[in-house]
Amino acid sequence: MDYKRFKGKHANIVIEIISLLEKGVKKAQEILEKPDAGSYTQLENSSGDTPIKADLALDKFLEETFLSLENVKSVFSEEKETPVTKENGSYLIAYDPLDGSSVMEANFLVGTIIGVYEKDYKAQNLVASLYVVFGHKIELVVALEEVYRYAFYQNKFHFIETIVLENKGKIIASGGNQKDFSLGLKKALEGFFAENYRLRYSGSMVADVHHVLVKKGGMFSYPQKKLRKLFEVFPLALMVEKAKGEAFYFDKGVKKRLLDQSVESYHEKSECYLASPHEAQILEKHLKGE
């Protein structure tokens, strides 16, 4: 893989992570391809969810992989109660080993989300994010100064494009229970559909955000506080912002930036809106003051 696009203070750690992913992504794919990979275990993770077998196997593999990095002092999986720490290193990695596990049995797109933090697990310390999606092909998307998309082919990641969102998209991925949507959100969605937007929601956050990014615009929303800040929300918020989109939530009817949020507990959750500029403007118009 050609790493010349990665520059700046945090380029080296990103390159090291990508190099490990390039070597290990086939192993990850093998874990997902096992016949019983989507079977539920009898366990409960720290968030109260019941993980599937692939969750735990992939988690173990990724934890060992990331801990092998000399400059990583802490590794934290969504499946664990607390981080695993080492004595030395400057960076911390928080990751969701298998986002979309609930739809894996239907053979939908799933993926791994990775957030790279410096010194502490805070949104303000998030310096890069990555995700890998597993489908009929494997893709890697990396956010550092810009957002780069790669496809895995013949044991290497090959550059596809730099992702920049357009002002206005054509797809929406609106997650959550619609009966609990606010009146403003319902009106915003009705307006999008009236403008011939297409609904593209799969139940896998990484897949739906990937779709918005690849199509160069649109909106992902999850208004209920269900998504975990450190492992899902912050990394994908950075991804969308670096692609010239907006990542926000509403606090008593006031639109606020997701990456300005604090973290009171490791597994704290948040509502989440990720959008290109036009969709962000429409959402603010309808949800402002609610």
Swiss-Prot record:
Q: Please indicate which superkingdom the organism of origin belongs to.
A: Bacteria
Upper lineage: Bacteria, Pseudomonadati, Campylobacterota, Epsilonproteobacteria, Campylobacterales
Regarding protein family, the annotation reads: Belongs to the FBPase class 1 family.
EC numbers: 3.1.3.11
Binding residues for Mg(2+) 2, per the UniProt record?
D96, D99, E232
The cofactors it requires, by name, are: Mg(2+)
Give the Gene Ontology MF terms in alphabetical order: fructose 1,6-bisphosphate 1-phosphatase activity; magnesium ion binding
UniProt keyword list? Carbohydrate metabolism, Cytoplasm, Hydrolase, Magnesium, Metal-binding
Q: Which Pfam families match?
A: FBPase, FBPase_C
Q: Which residues bind substrate?
A: D99, G100, S101, S102, Y201, K226
Q: Which GO terms describe its biological process?
A: fructose 1,6-bisphosphate metabolic process; fructose 6-phosphate metabolic process; fructose metabolic process; gluconeogenesis; sucrose biosynthetic process
Q: In which pathway does it act?
A: Carbohydrate biosynthesis; gluconeogenesis
Coiled-coil regions in this chain?
Answer: none
Full protein name: Fructose-1,6-bisphosphatase class 1
InterPro entries cross-referenced by the UniProt entry: FBPase_C_dom, FBPase_class-1, FBPase_N, SBPase
The residues that cross the membrane are none
Q: Subunit details for this protein?
A: Homotetramer.
Q: Which GO terms describe its cellular component?
A: cytosol
